[in-house]
Amino acid sequence: VHVISRKPFNEAIASFPGCAIALVDLLNVLEKKTFSDPQEMKSYLPSLDNFKYRKKWWVVDVAGNSLRLIAFMDFRLQKVFVKHIVSHAEYDRLTKYYRSHTE
């Protein structure tokens, strides 16, 4: 899969240094694997779930559920654009925002 930018990972590593190994591991899985569909990705990332307030956005728990990654994923084109890597509190705030600000 082509991860469009590493910047969100670098920023998350700086903000959450205790989760750095898990973030690097996740980035490596995304960059080294090819996933034809969400079910195949879920076999590597069991926490993968649809972010229901945006089309083609997905959520992955990171570092034992310490962080959440929210990303646009196009399985046909093999592209991932990470929108946010945040704590659960920030994830709840973002969910509330996207719920009330529809596309």
Describe the residue ranges of each PLM region.
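Basic, Lys/Arg-enriched alpha-helical interface segments
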Residues: 1-66, 74-81, 88-103
